[in-house]
């Protein structure tokens, strides 16, 4: 559907053998099973998104260089924001693995608090990251010439001249980079990734809810109550 690997799967009068039924009326375990899936799902989500985030940072650096604006203050600030975004997301993901929780059966799961923070940080920051890259690259992302223009013997010399970047960067070299940036940020694929950032592997609010639950489970409020009691001389 829409050129992406997505389907609508309909189960209509499907027979399921008894040996393939894993939860037969065990409703109390349903919530635990769902939440266990959530932590793994959030972990894999951030893991496979990090290369895309790194690519955005690389695109911004190259686009700024090719456009001759790498030394401009506000461009450097945007690039620093992209580094901050990528490395904070990575640090939270790695920390969720370091804080992993071992179950009695030997199964290991990511730390619920940290892995949801990682996913939330990624999702909340993705659109701003794309915006930074688009701003650095320029509006030519969507107005640049197509293949037929470059293949024209009449037009090609003009394109090479007027679309060139800083000294040493030809028009063709610059446009190859900008076409890649367009594919990541301004195409059907780019829009698809922006929607995924919001909804895939859990919505923004779902992640925040899990962070809140994990905070309560970690006993943050109970610790404060104990400290407040000690300060007031109450045990």
Residue map of PLM features:
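Short, charged, amphipathic alpha-helical segments
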Residues: 76-80, 108-116
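Glycine-rich beta->alpha junctions and the first turn(s) of the following alpha-helix
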Residues: 1-86
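Loop-to-helix element that buttresses phosphate recognition and phosphoryl-transfer chemistry
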Residues: 80-102, 121-124, 128, 134
């Amino acid at each position: 559907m829409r050129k992406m690997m997505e389907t609508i799967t309909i189960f209509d009068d499907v027979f399921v053998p008894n040996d393939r039924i894993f939860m037969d009326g065990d409703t109390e375990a349903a919530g635990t099973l769902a939440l266990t899936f959530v932590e793994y799902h959030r972990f894999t989500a951030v893991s496979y998104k990090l290369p895309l985030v790194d690519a955005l940072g690389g695109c911004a650096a190259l686009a700024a260089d090719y456009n001759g604006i790498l030394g401009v203050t506000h461009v450097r600030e945007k690039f620093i924001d992209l580094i901050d975004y990528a490395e904070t997301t990575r640090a939270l993901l790695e920390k969720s693995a370091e804080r992993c929780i071992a179950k009695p059966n030997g199964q290991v799961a990511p730390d619920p608090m940290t892995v949801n923070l990682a996913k939330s940080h990624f999702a909340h920051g993705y659109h701003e990251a794309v915006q930074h890259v688009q701003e650095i690259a320029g509006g030519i992302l969507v107005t640049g010439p197509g293949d037929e223009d470059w293949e024209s013997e009449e037009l090609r010399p003009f394109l090479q001249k007027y679309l060139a970047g800083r000294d040493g960067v030809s028009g063709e070299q610059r446009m190859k980079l900008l076409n890649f940036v367009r594919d990541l940020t301004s195409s059907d694929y780019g829009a698809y990734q922006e929607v995924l950032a919001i909804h895939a592997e859990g919505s923004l609010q779902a992640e925040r809810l899990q962070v809140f639950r994990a905070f309560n489970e970690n006993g943050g409020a109970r610790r404060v109550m104990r400290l407040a009691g000690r300060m007031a001389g109450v045990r």
